[in-house]
C-alpha cells in the first residue's frame, strides 16, 4: 500500500507513478507530471531519448514526428541525424530483432487461428520481437527491447529470419 501523492488516499499504487488510478482518471492535469516523469525515467535507464526530439531534421516515419538534432537519435532509437541526413541504423538490410519458437497453441495467437488444436504438436509459432518501438508503454511485457535498441543488437536479415521457418512452423507473430 502507498499513499497517493495527489489525493493522499492509501491504496495499491504503482511505485513508479506514485499516484492512484482515480487521480490519473479524474485529475489528469495534476497526475500528468508524475506520469511523464515515470516515462522519462523508464527510457533514461536505457540511454534512450526521454521524449521525441523537436529540433533538427524531421522524421516522418511514425506519429512522433521527431526532429532529430545533428548526431542524435530519434525516439525509436534506430533513426539518426548524421551530417544533416536521416540514417536508418537498422531495418533496411538488417533489423534489430530477436526470435524464438513457441509451441502452439500460444498466447499471442487466438486459438481459432491455428490448427494446433486440430493437428496438435509439433506445430509451432515463430515469435519475432523487434528491438525498437515508437511507443513507451510503462508496463510493457516486452520492455527488454530497450536493451536491443540501446546496443542495436542482435541484427538479423529478412533472409536469416525466413530461414527459421520449417515444416512445423504454422504461423509467425510479430
Task: Report each predicted region and the residues it spans.
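N-terminal juxtadomain amphipathic helix
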Residues: 13-120
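Conserved Radical SAM active-site core
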Residues: 78-174
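Short Cys/His-rich zinc-binding micro-motifs
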Residues: 4-13
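Short metal-coordination and nucleic-acid-contact micro-motifs, chiefly zinc-binding Cys/His arrays
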Residues: 1-3, 16, 55-58, 72, ...
Amino acid at each position: 500500500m502507498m499513499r497517493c501523492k495527489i489525493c493522499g488516499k492509501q491504496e495499491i499504487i504503482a511505485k513508479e507513478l506514485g499516484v492512484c488510478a482515480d487521480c490519473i482518471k479524474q485529475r489528469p492535469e495534476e497526475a500528468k507530471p508524475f506520469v511523464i516523469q515515470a516515462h522519462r525515467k523508464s527510457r533514461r535507464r536505457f540511454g534512450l531519448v526521454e521524449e521525441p526530439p523537436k529540433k533538427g531534421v524531421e522524421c516522418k516515419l511514425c506519429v512522433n514526428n521527431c526532429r532529430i538534432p545533428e548526431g542524435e537519435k530519434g525516439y525509436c532509437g534506430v533513426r539518426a541525424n548524421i551530417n544533416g541526413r536521416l540514417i536508418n541504423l537498422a531495418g533496411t538490410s538488417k533489423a534489430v530483432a530477436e526470435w524464438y519458437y513457441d509451441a502452439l497453441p500460444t498466447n499471442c495467437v487466438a486459438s481459432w487461428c491455428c490448427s494446433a488444436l486440430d493437428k496438435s504438436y509439433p506445430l509451432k509459432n515463430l515469435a519475432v520481437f523487434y528491438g525498437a518501438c515508437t511507443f513507451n508503454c510503462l508496463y510493457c511485457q516486452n520492455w527488454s527491447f530497450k536493451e536491443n535498441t540501446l546496443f542495436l543488437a542482435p541484427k538479423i536479415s529478412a533472409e536469416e529470419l525466413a530461414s527459421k521457418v520449417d515444416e512445423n512452423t504454422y504461423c509467425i507473430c510479430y
